[in-house]
């Protein structure tokens, strides 16, 4: 049974539908493409073509064009729409055209930076060019830090390390601050409350130091879909931004279902365990060979779900390899 058939069956199942409070269907969308810009370094298109990228999504091209005009931008498009390319292309293009150019990437967590930067490493290795990319965080060995400060074209770090490990020691980072062309801030929706206000102050210290050393970097911010991305980005960096919120990536049909676990005690209003219902529904999907991602609120929840789900979907030989747990 494929996903479409399973959805049709669930819609006809009263015991399931009586617990659904809302069901929204978002139709599929065709991709919108744009050619590579003429300003793009000629070493990039062949490498992208090797990865199956022969043209850009419209929002990726818009991001490149706005960056080329010197504007600060904020990209707000769905997951898996190619946001990473929106900042990697302008950054790599600038460094390939001027080997002195530098870029600073900020991610809220070390795990996220490791995931996102892997694509950047692959592009650089495929081009076989001398663009040195380093991660600079608490795990960076002391012996490697001098090389990062002196030779790093792209420095990948987090707000805490920027605050405590880079800005106070700016005299050791002269090469970076004198030539800083781009500052990339990914996942800006994570910077809210005290965390967000702290980052805003750190960014103001960063821009003040850049002015002292004679540079004026552009900011490229990326965010998940939120109500006020432009306002948030402008508040964080202290400057107006151009918002790119129309994704050119294709998307399949989506079903958004709000589901309440069934009531097991009407007098007390007690409902069935969320964990048990999650296991039941996800087992149904896995049994029908439908690729599924289940999110838990904590690491413990993920571990419990993974263990029980593996028990439910074991084949006759005891193999539960179709189910894997993932933690950042």
Segments predicted by a language model, with ranges:
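Walker A/P-loop
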Residues: 84
């Amino acid at each position: 049974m494929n996903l479409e058939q399973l959805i049709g069956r669930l819609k006809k199942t009263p015991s399931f539908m009586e617990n659904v409070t809302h069901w929204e269907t978002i139709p599929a969308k065709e991709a919108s493409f744009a050619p590579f810009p003429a300003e793009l370094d000629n070493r990039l298109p062949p490498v992208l073509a090797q990865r199956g990228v022969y043209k850009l999504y419209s929002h990726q091209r818009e991001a490149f064009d706005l960056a080329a005009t010197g504007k600060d931008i904020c990209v707000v498009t769905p997951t898996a729409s190619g946001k990473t390319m929106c900042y990697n292309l302008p950054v790599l293009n600038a460094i390939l055209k001027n080997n002195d150019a530098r870029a600073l990437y900020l991610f809220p967590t070390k795990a996220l930076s490791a995931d996102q930067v892997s694509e950047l490493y692959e592009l650089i290795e495929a081009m076989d060019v001398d663009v040195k990319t380093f991660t600079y965080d608490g795990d960076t060995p002391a012996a490697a830090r001098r090389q990062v400060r002196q030779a790093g074209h792209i420095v990948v770090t987090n707000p805490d390390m920027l605050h405590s490990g880079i800005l106070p020691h700016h005299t050791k980072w002269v090469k970076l601050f004198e030539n800083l062309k781009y500052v990339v801030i990914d996942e800006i929706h994570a910077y809210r409350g005290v965390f967000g206000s702290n980052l805003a102050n750190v960014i103001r210290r960063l821009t003040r130091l850049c002015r002292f050393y004679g540079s004026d970097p552009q900011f490229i911010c990326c965010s998940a879909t939120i109500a006020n991305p432009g306002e948030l980005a402008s508040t964080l960096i202290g400057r107006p931004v151009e918002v790119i919120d129309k994704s050119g990536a294709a998307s399949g049909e989506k079903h958004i279902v709000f589901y309440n676990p069934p009531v097991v005690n009407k007098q007390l209003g007690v409902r069935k365990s969320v964990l048990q219902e999650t296991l039941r529904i996800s087992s149904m999907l896995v049994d029908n060979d439908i690729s599924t991602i289940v999110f838990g609120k904590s690491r413990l929840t993920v571990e419990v779900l993974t263990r029980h789900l593996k028990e439910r979907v074991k084949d006759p030989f005891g193999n539960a390899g179709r189910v894997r747990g993932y933690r950042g």
